[in-house]
Amino acid sequence: MFFVTPAYAEEAPAAATGTDAHAAPAAGEVHTETGVAEGEHARGPFPPFDSTTYASQLLWLVITFSVFYLLMQKVIAPRIGAILDQRHTRISQDLEEAGRLKAEADAAVQTYEGELAAARAKSNAIGSAARDAAKAKAEEDRRAVEASLSEKIKAAEVRIADIKAKAFADVGTIAEETAAAVVEQLIGGTAAQADVAAAVAAAKKEA
């Protein structure tokens, strides 16, 4: 706890007043300088729209544009041109390759179609020749069979004729013998062989 004496109390306000008087101008000066700076900053135009900086702005614009133009002309544009040329060359090569492959495919298709047509023609020719050969062989076999049958029929007819002739001859002999036996039984005597044969022959003619 502090005790303030009357003498100290009188001196203290004077000292404080002197100190404040000495310090106030400094604070005022700082305040005044700060106020002036802040006022100027608040009242000044937007820097890009400040006419006093147009020259520097135009200069930097020209410099920036020139640098950008040089960059485009020397670096970016050549790279883009090289890329476009490379793409154009690649596309041209791809188109040429596609055309070559298409031509090869068309040639292969034509060759295949030609070979297929030749194979069909050959197959048709072989089939036709086989049919003609089979038809000729069948005709030849038919003629051979017909000739063989004709010969067999002729031989059979000759044989049948011989059998008929022999049978008729045997029938005549049997008839003559039978007639002679009948006459012998009827008249009690033998008839002449010539008469019996003549009678049998006459009977054959009448039959």
Swiss-Prot record:
Keywords: ATP synthesis, Cell inner membrane, Cell membrane, CF(0), Hydrogen ion transport, Ion transport, Membrane, Transmembrane, Transmembrane helix, Transport. The chain crosses the membrane at residues 53-72. It is found in: Cell inner membrane. InterPro entries: ATP_synth_b/b'su_bac/chlpt (IPR002146), ATP_synthase_B_chain (IPR050059). It is a single-pass membrane protein. It comes from the Bacteria. One of its GO terms (cellular component) is proton-transporting ATP synthase complex. GO terms for molecular function: proton-transporting ATP synthase activity, rotational mechanism; proton-transporting ATPase activity, rotational mechanism. CDD domains: ATP-synt_Fo_b. Its main location: membrane. F-type ATPases have 2 components, F(1) - the catalytic core - and F(0) - the membrane proton channel. F(1) has five subunits: alpha(3), beta(3), gamma(1), delta(1), epsilon(1). F(0) has three main subunits: a(1), b(2) and c(10-14). The alpha and beta chains form an alternating ring which encloses part of the gamma chain. F(1) is attached to F(0) by a central stalk formed by the gamma and epsilon chains, while a peripheral stalk is formed by the delta and b chains. Belongs to the ATPase B chain family. F(1)F(0) ATP synthase produces ATP from ADP in the presence of a proton or sodium gradient. F-type ATPases consist of two structural domains, F(1) containing the extramembraneous catalytic core and F(0) containing the membrane proton channel, linked together by a central stalk and a peripheral stalk. During catalysis, ATP synthesis in the catalytic domain of F(1) is coupled via a rotary mechanism of the central stalk subunits to proton translocation. Component of the F(0) channel, it forms part of the peripheral stalk, linking F(1) to F(0). The b'-subunit is a diverged and duplicated form of b found in plants and photosynthetic bacteria. This is ATP synthase subunit b 2. The lineage of its organism: Bacteria, Pseudomonadati, Pseudomonadota, Alphaproteobacteria, Hyphomicrobiales.
